[in-house]
């Protein structure tokens, strides 16, 4: 999904659910969620995750005490949360400084272009980035931000 499409869906989501209350989202009419731009599968994921938050199964107040890998494992145990989403939570919500979101195709391709890597496919580019980014520790999130800035002509305010 493009940044522009995601921003549009997020704007419509906030217009419909301004408080972003887990209980309200858990019991939301699926048609209303589809109307803001979510697919049937995403509606299942969003309402399921909201139910987990509402039930207290997800405890964001405890996230800061977890190591990156432990938090990533916790998040990806939720249906619909994959490695990319977990990495975005680590970077943007938890502000972890050393996250390298190798599942971000835009990041991988932009790094290959910026560094002039002649890797034949995405898998090879991803591995080249993983190895190269070791030198960025413990600031891989920061390096990721700079590559994303290069990717987007217009800065995105997060």
Model-inferred region functions:
Residues 1-79:
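Alpha-helical ds-nucleic-acid-binding substructure associated with the helix-hairpin-helix region
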Residues 44, 64, 68, 83-158:
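C-terminal accessory module of base-excision DNA glycosylases/AP lyases that mediates lesion recognition
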